[in-house]
């Protein structure tokens, strides 16, 4: 955080608060606050597009019941000399509620956030951008191709990182003028998002680091090529092993694994807080022969690999979802079913045995492996998740198709080739893996990075790998102790025991952090650095319990049922560490 006097900031806020809501929420005031063309290099504002309307007693943010008065503003700009048009929505708190803050919310799937009101709860101006491709109504995957073989690179770069960075830079400038603040006044700027919203947050930290004071990034979908193709991996395992397990068999394998590994962390509470100990000590073959039963019903694929937990700030979270009938399933776990599960948890390797990517932690749901019932044949068949299939068709094959029709002639080597093609093609846009965060760190930025340990969509180890890359690149000349001490001053990473994708887990009643923004604001504005992360258990025997989670690389170990220690466990940490020799270039 750049150093500013708290007294000076308070004085600025007082000045802003002195203005009336009706005085500031006008088209003329917004136009006067716009940056003059040439002020922000490459940005030319379009004053004729400005709108400003006061709104009263409006709800704001996802799931909030609190109401606010705010100024609903629309502005537009063009990239100098290009002739395009980008529309931005801003929500300005009434002056008495403004607390010198700017807030950016992430989206999810292939959608940027379309809601500008998320910052109102924090006294912050918020924004949302259409990114120049009408992102309020279109998701990026709908516009990524102009036609077969032709990539829409403008939309790609805007979705990848550019649109949010420009929205933030423009928004902070307008904010100062809107409230009558001086041009050198401080506006604390925050980002918050999960899933692709987490990736978007990392893109801002990596490429627009000097614009932000604090970023909260959950389960980032970075390493985009590997992540998206990985959604096809489970189907390829089933095809390669020629076994398509009934969904109930996989559920039994997962639930039996949870039951077996639950006590390894020192407390039996239905939560596998130490998937590393599970990986090191539990053998899936011990489940062979156990009975399973599931009643007939329908199954809904939630799209983008989401499981049945709460999610935050996702515009089209059911994108790619399908519903299918499932008959009653009754049987025992087979050796072939266990082989499928084990191969998925082991991760993708090429035909030479070289590792290409990491996978989900053992005890995570095997959502991508869910097969589809064919009522004509009475058999379970391949069900390719559109999450990964669409990425292959549109981003790799450059065909305007929503999914792969089959995996004929596809091998593990094919998946590696797809990953490599995507990594190279989108290295400077979607991949989002730059490990040198010096501009963000040196300008005082704070990064709170978290990931559900049992995430069935984006592997938790993906976040661990990136944290390790940042440590290695930025502090490779320091001892491990020195590097950890330096990192925790500005970059803190937390695994959430038992948690699923961007939310709680219906299979494991574990804790989940609920006040990350309050923690971040206190860290940035008051200098109160956290050492552990506050999280609350919302269901099960321990519902209502508050847990202070361990900061990586320390791991939790319960002492009885009431408290746990954060311990160093090198063998366990090693189980989270990966190299990817299947690729010829470093994979951060």
UniProtKB/Swiss-Prot annotation:
**Which reaction is recorded as catalysed by this protein?**
digallate + H2O = 2 3,4,5-trihydroxybenzoate + H(+)
User: Would you say which domain of life the source belongs to?
Assistant: Eukaryota
Q: List the disulfide bonds.
A: 25-71, 194-502, 261-278
Where on the chain is Pyrrolidone carboxylic acid found, per UniProt?
317
Q: How is it modified after translation?
A: The protein is glycosylated to a carbohydrate content of 22.7%.
| The protein's Enzyme Commission number | 3.1.1.20
Q: Which UniProt keywords apply?
A: Calcium, Cleavage on pair of basic residues, Disulfide bond, Glycoprotein, Hydrolase, Metal-binding, Pyrrolidone carboxylic acid, Serine esterase, Signal
| Enzyme active site | 195, 455, 501
Q: Give the signal peptide, or none.
A: 1-18
Annotated positions for site Cleavage: 316-317
Q: Where does Ca(2+) bind?
A: 262, 265, 269, 271
Query: GO molecular function of the protein, one example?
Result: metal ion binding
Q: Which Pfam families match?
A: Tannase
- Assembly and partners? Heterooctamer of 4 33 kDa and 4 30 kDa subunits linked by disulfide bond(s).
Family designation: Belongs to the tannase family.
UniProt function note? Hydrolyzes ester bonds of tannic acid to produce gallic acid and glucose.
Name of this chain's protein: Tannase
What is the originating organism of this protein?
Aspergillus oryzae (strain ATCC 42149 / RIB 40)
């Amino acid at each position: 955080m750049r150093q500013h006097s708290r007294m000076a900031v308070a004085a600025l806020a007082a000045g802003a608060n002195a203005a009336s809501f009706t005085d500031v929420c006008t088209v003329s005031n917004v136009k006067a606050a716009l940056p003059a063309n040439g002020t922000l290099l490459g940005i030319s504002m379009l004053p004729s597009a400005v709108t400003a309307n006061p709104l009263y007693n409006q709800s704001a943010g996802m799931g909030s019941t609190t109401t606010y008065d705010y100024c609903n503003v629309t502005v537009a700009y063009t990239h100098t000399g290009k002739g395009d048009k980008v529309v931005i929505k801003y929500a300005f708190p009434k002056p008495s509620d403004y607390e010198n803050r700017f807030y950016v919310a992430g989206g999810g799937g292939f959608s940027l956030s379309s809601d500008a009101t998320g910052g109102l709860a924090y006294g912050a101006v918020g924004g949302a951008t259409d990114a120049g491709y009408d992102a309020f109504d279109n998701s990026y995957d709908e516009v990524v191709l102009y036609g077969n073989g032709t990539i829409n690179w403008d939309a790609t770069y805007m979705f990848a990182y550019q649109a949010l960075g420009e929205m933030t830079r423009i928004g902070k400038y307008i904010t100062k003028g809107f409230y009558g603040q001086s041009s050198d006044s401080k506006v604390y700027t925050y980002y918050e998002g999960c899933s692709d919203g987490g990736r978007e947050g990392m893109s801002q930290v990596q490429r627009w680091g000097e614009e932000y004071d604090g970023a909260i990034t959950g389960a980032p979908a970075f390493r985009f090529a590997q992540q998206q193709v990985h959604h096809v991996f489970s189907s390829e395992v089933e095809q390669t092993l020629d076994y398509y397990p009934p969904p109930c068999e996989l559920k039994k394998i997962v639930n039996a694994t949870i039951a077996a590994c639950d006590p390894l962390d020192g407390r039996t509470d239905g939560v596998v807080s130490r998937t590393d100990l599970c990986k090191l000590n539990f053998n899936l073959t011990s489940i062979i022969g156990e009975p399973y039963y599931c009643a007939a019903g329908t199954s809904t694929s939630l799209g983008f690999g989401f499981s049945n937990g709460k999610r935050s700030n996702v515009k089209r979270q059911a994108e790619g979802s399908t519903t299918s009938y499932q008959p009653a399933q009754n049987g025992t776990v087979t050796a072939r079913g266990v082989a499928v599960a084990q191969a998925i948890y082991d991760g993708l390797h090429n035909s030479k045995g070289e590792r290409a990517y990491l996978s989900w932690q053992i005890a995570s749901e095997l959502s991508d492996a869910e097969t589809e019932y064919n009522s004509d044949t009475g058999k379970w068949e391949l069900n390719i998740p559109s999450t990964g299939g669409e990425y292959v068709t549109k981003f790799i094959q450059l065909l305007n198709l929503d999914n792969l029709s089959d995996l004929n002639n596809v091998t593990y080597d094919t998946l590696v080739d797809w990953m490599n093609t995507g990594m190279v093609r989108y290295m400077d846009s979607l991949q989002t893996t730059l490990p040198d965060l010096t501009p963000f760190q040196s300008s005082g930025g704070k990064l709170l990075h978290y990931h559900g340990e049992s995430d069935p969509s984006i592997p938790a180890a993906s976040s661990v790998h990136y944290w390790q890359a940042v440590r290695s690149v930025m502090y490779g000349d320091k001892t491990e102790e020195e590097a950890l001490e330096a990192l925790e001053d500005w970059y803190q990473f937390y695994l959430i025991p038992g948690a699923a994708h961007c939310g709680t887990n219906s299979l494991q009643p574990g804790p989940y952090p609920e006040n990350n923004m309050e923690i971040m604001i206190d860290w940035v504005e008051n200098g109160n650095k956290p050492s552990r992360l506050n999280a609350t258990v919302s269901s099960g025997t321990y519902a209502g319990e508050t847990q202070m989670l361990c900061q990586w690389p320390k791991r939790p170990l319960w002492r009885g049922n009431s408290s746990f220690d954060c311990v160093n466990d090198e063998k366990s940490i090693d189980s989270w560490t990966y190299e990817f020799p299947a690729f010829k270039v470093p994979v951060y």
